[in-house]
Curated annotation (Swiss-Prot):
Residues 20-404 are virion surface. It comes from Murine coronavirus (strain A59). Residues 426-428 are intravirion. The gene is HE. It is found in: Virion membrane; Host cell membrane. Its EC number is 3.1.1.53. This is Hemagglutinin-esterase. Residues 279-392 are annotated as: Esterase domain 2.
Length: 428
C-alpha cells in the first residue's frame, strides 16, 4: 500500500505514479524471439513484379527490411483458402513457434464466388470462416504448415467432374466423381479409398451440396437429390459425415444451393469416402500439420480491402480465444503510394512490430517490457509484466514485488553514496 504520509512511502507513491501509463500494450503483431513466421498475400509479397512505374515494393504493408528474413510465405492475389480449394494454387509453406497470418482478402464478397448459377456466396463465406477457424486452432499447436496432395483409388469408370466454377475460379478440392453410365439416376452408393500419410495431422474438406440438387443433362431421370457425404477411418473405425438439410435448390425459382464444407483434422491412416446419393466427393489436397509445440496462440491481422470494395469479417470470426489474437486498426484501409488497397499507413505501423522482439504477447497487444504495466496481460505468453493500478481517491499501488525490491536496492545505494560524499567532504 502506498500512502502519502512519510518520505519513504511518498517516494513509493511517486514511483507508482511513474509506472502508471508505462509499458502499455501496443497494437502490433510481433514475436518473443526469432522463431516466428508470417503467411501473407501481396501486402507481404516481396517477389511480386510489376511494370506500372510505381516505386519498388511500394505495395507492401510489411517493412521491406524483412524481405530477406526467410520468415515470409506470401503470394500476390492468393490466400490459404484460395489455394486450398481452387486450381489457383500457391504452395504456402512455413515453420515457426509464433505464427502470424495477414491474408484472406483474396477470397471475399467482392469476388462473389458461387459453385452454381443460382448458388449462394454467403455459404462460401461460412466455409471461409470454418476453414480459418480450424487453421488458427491447429497452428497454435503445430510449428509447420504446408500443402500436400491426396491421391485416391476409385473402382468405377466415372471420371472427376468439374461442376463448381465461375469466370475466374475452378474448384479442385474436393474432387467430385461423375455418375456411372450404367445407372439411370444418382440413387446409388459410391465409394473411394484415400490414404493420409507423412504428417502429424491433416486438415481436409468434407463437402456436400446442402439442399436439393437437380441432376445434370446426362441424368435421364431429371430428379432432385439430397447430398450425403462421409469419410470413414478404416484403421480405428471412426465415421465423419453429414447430410444436406436445407430446403433450397439450384433454379431461379428455388435458389441458394451451394457447397457447404466442414474442415476435419484427421490423423494419418486409411480412409474411405462414401456417398449415399448424388456425387461422391473426396479430398485432393490437404494442409499438412507437422511438429507439435507448446501451445502458442497465432496472431491474425485483419485482411480487408479499402472501403471502395466489399470485404468480410470471416478471419475475425474465425480468430477466437484462446488460440488466436486478432489485430486491427480503427480506420478504413487507405492505400497510399501504390493504390487504394496497398500501403496503408496504420497497417504498416501494425506490422512494424515484426522488426523487433517483445517480452509478452497477449490479447490486448504486445508488451515491450516484462516489469510492470498499467494493464494486466490477458492470455499472456512470454515474460509478461505485472499490472500496477493506482486509485486517485485513495492512492493504492498494487505492484510486482521485484521492481519494489530493485527500488529499495537503488535507494540503499543512493544512501551509501550520500554518506560517502558527506564523509569525503567532511574529511576535506
Amino acid at each position: 500500500m502506498c500512502i502519502a504520509m512519510a518520505p519513504r512511502t511518498l517516494l513509493l507513491l511517486i514511483x507508482c505514479q511513474l509506472v502508471f501509463g508505462f509499458n502499455e500494450p501496443l497494437n502490433i503483431v510481433s514475436h518473443l524471439n526469432d522463431d516466428w513466421f508470417l503467411f501473407g498475400d501481396s501486402r507481404s509479397d516481396c517477389t511480386y513484379v510489376e511494370n506500372n512505374g510505381h516505386p519498388k515494393l511500394d505495395w507492401l504493408d510489411l517493412d521491406p527490411k524483412l524481405c530477406n528474413s526467410g520468415k515470409i510465405s506470401a503470394k500476390s492475389g492468393n490466400s490459404l483458402f484460395r489455394s486450398f480449394h481452387f486450381t489457383d494454387f500457391y504452395n504456402y509453406t512455413g515453420e515457426g513457434d509464433q505464427i502470424v497470418f495477414y491474408e484472406g482478402v483474396n477470397f471475399s464478397p467482392s469476388h462473389g464466388f458461387k459453385c452454381l448459377a443460382h448458388g449462394d456466396n454467403k455459404r462460401w463465406m461460412g466455409n471461409k470462416a470454418r476453414f480459418y477457424a480450424r487453421v488458427y486452432e491447429k497452428m497454435a499447436q503445430y510449428r509447420s504448415l504446408s500443402f500436400v496432395n491426396v491421391s485416391y483409388a476409385y473402382g468405377g469408370n466415372a471420371k472427376p467432374a468439374s461442376i463448381c466454377k465461375d469466370n475466374t475460379l475452378t474448384l479442385n478440392n474436393p474432387t467430385f466423381i461423375s455418375k456411372e453410365s450404367n445407372y439411370v439416376d444418382y440413387y446409388y452408393e459410391s465409394e473411394a479409398n484415400f490414404t493420409l500419410e507423412g504428417c502429424d495431422e491433416f486438415i481436409v474438406p468434407l463437402c456436400g451440396f446442402n439442399g436439393h440438387s437437380k441432376g445434370s443433362s446426362s441424368d435421364a431421370a431429371n430428379k432432385y437429390y439430397t447430398d450425403s457425404q462421409s469419410y470413414y477411418n478404416m484403421d480405428i473405425g471412426v465415421l465423419y459425415g453429414f447430410n444436406s438439410t436445407l430446403d433450397v435448390g439450384n433454379t431461379a425459382k428455388d435458389p441458394g444451393l451451394d457447397l457447404t464444407c466442414r474442415y476435419l483434422a484427421l490423423t494419418p491412416g486409411n480412409y474411405k469416402a462414401v456417398s449415399l446419393e448424388y456425387l461422391l466427393s473426396l479430398p485432393s489436397k490437404a494442409i499438412c500439420l507437422h511438429k507439435t509445440k507448446r501451445f502458442m496462440p497465432v496472431q491474425v491481422v485483419d485482411s480487408r480491402w479499402s472501403s471502395i470494395r466489399q470485404s468480410d469479417n470471416m478471419t475475425a470470426a474465425a480468430c477466437q480465444l484462446p488460440y488466436c489474437f486478432f489485430r486491427n486498426t480503427s480506420a478504413n484501409y487507405s492505400g497510399g503510394t501504390h493504390d487504394a488497397h496497398h500501403g496503408d499507413f496504420h497497417f504498416r505501423q501494425l506490422l512494424s512490430g515484426l522488426l523487433y522482439n517483445v517480452s509478452c504477447i497477449a490479447q490486448q497487444g504486445a508488451f515491450l517490457y516484462n516489469n510492470v504495466s498499467s494493464s494486466w496481460p490477458a492470455y499472456g505468453y512470454g515474460h509478461c509484466p505485472t499490472a500496477a493500478n493506482i486509485g486517485y481517491m485513495a492512492p493504492v499501488c498494487i505492484y510486482d514485488p521485484l521492481p519494489v525490491i530493485l527500488l529499495g536496492v537503488l535507494l540503499g545505494i543512493a544512501v551509501l553514496i550520500i554518506v560517502f560524499l558527506n564523509v569525503l567532504f567532511y574529511d576535506g
